[in-house]
Amino acid sequence: MPQVFKIGPYWVYFWANEQDPLEPVHVHIALGAPRENATKVWITRRGKCLLCNNNSKIPETVLRNMMRIIEARSSEVIEKWKGFFGTADFFC
């Protein structure tokens, strides 16, 4: 799975086996190795994060801090998404 970056022991990554049609820009977050059905965060047009689910059961304060970092690096996330998937649509 394409790793976008790491935040401490957590991976922030794209799941390469996305559905067709391609879902809007989002990242998954998991402790240790990437895995299917990990925590999912949508990236909005304005670079904000919206929590889709917390399947990885990341503690709330940790997740909130990670989402702030992802927002600060959202342009990097979007560019990497476009580079990997060839297009970028947004949830909102």
Regions found by a protein language model. Name each.
Residues 4, 16, 71-75:
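Alpha-helical interaction segments
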Residues 8, 32, 47, 83-86:
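Residue-identity detector for glycine
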Residues 19-60:
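A short, structured beta-strand/loop element
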